[in-house]
A protein has these predicted regions:
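Conserved acidic segment of CheY-like receiver
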Residues: 9
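Short acidic active-site motifs
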Residues: 39-43
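Cationic, amphipathic, low-complexity alpha-helical segments enriched
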Residues: 1-3
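FMN-binding flavodoxin-like domain, especially the glycine-rich phosphate-binding loop
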Residues: 5, 14, 18-21, 25-35, ...
Length: 151
């Protein structure tokens, strides 16, 4: 979440903490407010200029708590961005649908591989071991810098 010239995101990292690793790196570099959508299902976001939604991808969807949070709390006409980690592939359809009626302006999306042992992947030892790695994490910070710099 970005308060005027500050920064921010949203996370509900529940599997291996992959998405939280990206957000922790952004928090270390920028002034942001993190809100855990699992623990805080309702929050007034009107004071924020930019609102980011971050999640692991679960069966091609953002975490249900993040989707619910977005649908309930996202104000009209705000700038938004998405950050995700995934074992298979990035898919932003669910969060985009949750924000359809909010007239938000999408600033960008960042996604990277994340270690995944969800469901059948556990039997194979998981997907994307070692991710997010340092390059993935640096990419998330660079993405945040790019979308928040004044043009």
């Amino acid at each position: 979440l970005q308060r005027h010239q500050a920064g921010g995101e949203r996370a509900a990292s529940t599997h291996h903490g992959n998405t939280k690793k990206l957000l922790d790196a952004i928090v270390a570099a920028y002034e942001v407010d993190l809100i855990d959508a699992v623990k805080v299902p309702e929050k007034d976001l009107n004071r924020y200029d930019r609102i980011g939604f971050a999640s692991g991808i679960y069966y091609s969807k953002f975490h249900q708590a993040v989707l619910n949070f977005a649908a309930v709390n996202m104000p009209q006409n705000k700038q938004t961005f998405f950050i995700s980690t995934y074992g298979g592939k990035a898919d932003y359809t669910s969060i985009e649908k949750a924000l359809t009626a909010k007239n938000s302006v999408l600033l960008g999306k960042y996604g990277c591989k994340g270690y995944d042992t969800f469901g059948p992947f556990k039997l194979m030892g998981g997907l994307a071991k070692g991710h997010p790695d340092e390059a993935d994490i640096a990419g998330a910070v660079a993405f945040y810098k790019e979308i928040t710099e004044e043009k």
